[in-house]
Amino acid sequence: MKKLVFKAMILAFVVIGSISTIGCKKEDGVVTPVTLDETNQQLVDALFSVSNLDLTGYNDSEVYVMNSNDDLWQLVGDMNIIIPEVDFEKYSIVWGYVVVPHTGYVLSSMELSVSNGNYTMNVEIFKGETGFQAITNRVFWGVYPKIEEPISLNVSYIYVIE
């Protein structure tokens, strides 16, 4: 069930990302995600089969930049998964997760920005009214024009006022 929810969330990001365009330079502002239509479902499957990371407990939230198939294999770590061909000469995959203390938290937006050559992934988490107390995580990812620099993660929580 958890995998199904994660896949649905990523599918929503893919659909949102499909209206994006290519052509971002290293200027200050928002970095637009790229959609690779023929590989999206394989990428979703691969990025949600991540087996080399311990995403349980009180781990910090993380963000990774993948610039090669080797990077992608290190993250996925499962030889039974089909890894799509991604042109890593042109693109990078940004993958991350945010640890949340409640199952009702929903990833409401993500935005990669660059300022003075420094990249930041801004993730907004919305706390819905339903759910229960449990340490869990919310996964996010996107395909972007080539990124060589590390990315810092900024997480904002939006709470429902009752």
What is each of the regions a protein language model found here?
Residues A8, W73, I151-N154:
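A broad, structure-centric signal for solvent-exposed, well-ordered loop/edge residues
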Residues M9-I19:
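Bacterial N-terminal signal peptides
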Residues P101-E162:
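Extracytoplasmic electrostatic interaction patches
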Residues K2-L4, G17-V44, S156-E162:
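Bacterial Sec-dependent N-terminal signal peptides
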